[in-house]
Amino acid sequence: MSLWKKTLYKSVCLALALLVAVTVFQRSVTPGQFLQDPLPPTLGPPKTGSLVNPNSFWKSSKDVVAPTPTVPRGPQVWDVVTTNCSINVNLTHQPWFQNLEPHFRQFLAYQHCRYFPMLLNHPEKCAGDVYLLVVVKSVITQHDRREVIRQTWGHEWESAGPDRGAVRTLFLLGTASKQEERTHYQQLLAYEDRLYGDILQWDFLDSFFNLTLKEIHFLKWLDIYCPNVPFIFKGDDDVFVNPTNLLEFLSDRQPQENLFVGDVLKHARPIRKKDNKYYIPAVMYSKATYPPYAGGGGFLMSGSLARQLHHACDTLELFPIDDVFLGMCLEVLGVKPTGHEGFKTFGISRVRGSRMNKEPCFYRSMLVVHKLLPAELLAMWDLVHSNLTCSLKFQVL
């Protein structure tokens, strides 16, 4: 090779190396923003046919509901592009505020900050005929849970049965809570999203109190991108779900219903013990009881009600417990959540050591069971879908 060709070759190599270095640097400075146009997902071949069990075990009698009021459509794209949120200085000087625990002070000081930019978005998930949207709350570090869900109950289907559309799955995430880990995990998440194309991510920290942000961000996203999806299942990333039973339950439901069904807690009292995860000081909620709400392990709702919820939630101040906050939004609408025995937020049996919590025949009869580790979920899924012989289905446990 001549000298000028060698020089040209070295120059080209150096330019490529610099381009790669600049790209990596930009990704580390603005995590998530570099993936504006992700590659198409590489999902396995979709299953076809009906998921609905021919038996009508989960078809229950339902209350007559009033027609759903028309809800005005909001913006047609996610319209929050910058994070411009400052502390509420007026609040910080109040004596009652200064007496609160640090995490409550943090929550209240930024309570007015409701919406944040999107880092990862997949509006195409609602394109075409979608019957059920499966939405899973997750955190950036829980890749193993998301992977097991994709292999089991979160697997997408092209048909939910005769005359019914597809089943699509999405995961809801914020950003890593630890600053020193954020860039690393964001790059891993970007790769995961390139593989599967099923992650919605917003630019707020994933924390317990920010679960409420995740609720309102999803409701806003749904209102923008999914105006016609009939039903939504929303759950945690540590639950067992039986999609066949979910679809059987929905088979005689109408999208226009104000449907919100799960493991409903009524007359629950605010916890005042400071060492409890769900402790709420009286200054933040002074009433004796919460409105009825569904435990966050998982619940079903109609798309029409979800769009109403988006607007109802915008009329309320944010509350640090997301399940209770949704109950407050339902109360604004005058809608009462419906309890169902197939949703087990606290396990099939509340006694942790009970053998029922490991019995696959019970899981075959349920809709949602909370909670399982990834290995437990995978093992139970295989058992439930094996040549298992169960004497009967259990309606009330």
UniProtKB/Swiss-Prot annotation:
Positions on the Lumenal side per record topology: 27-397
Cross-referenced InterPro entries: Glyco_trans_31
Classification via PANTHER family: BETA-1,3-N-ACETYLGLUCOSAMINYLTRANSFERASE, UDP-GLCNAC:BETAGAL BETA-1,3-N-ACETYLGLUCOSAMINYLTRANSFERASE 7
Originating organism: Rattus norvegicus
One term under GO cellular component: Golgi membrane
Topology with respect to the bilayer: Single-pass type II membrane protein
Localization: Golgi apparatus membrane
Glycan attachment sites: 84, 90, 210, 387
EC number annotated for this UniProt entry: 2.4.1.-
Transmembrane regions listed in the UniProt entry: 7-26
Keyword Hydrolase among record annotations: no
One GO BP annotation of this record: poly-N-acetyllactosamine biosynthetic process
Protein name: UDP-GlcNAc:betaGal beta-1,3-N-acetylglucosaminyltransferase 7
Entry keywords, A to Z: Glycoprotein, Glycosyltransferase, Golgi apparatus, Membrane, Signal-anchor, Transferase, Transmembrane, Transmembrane helix
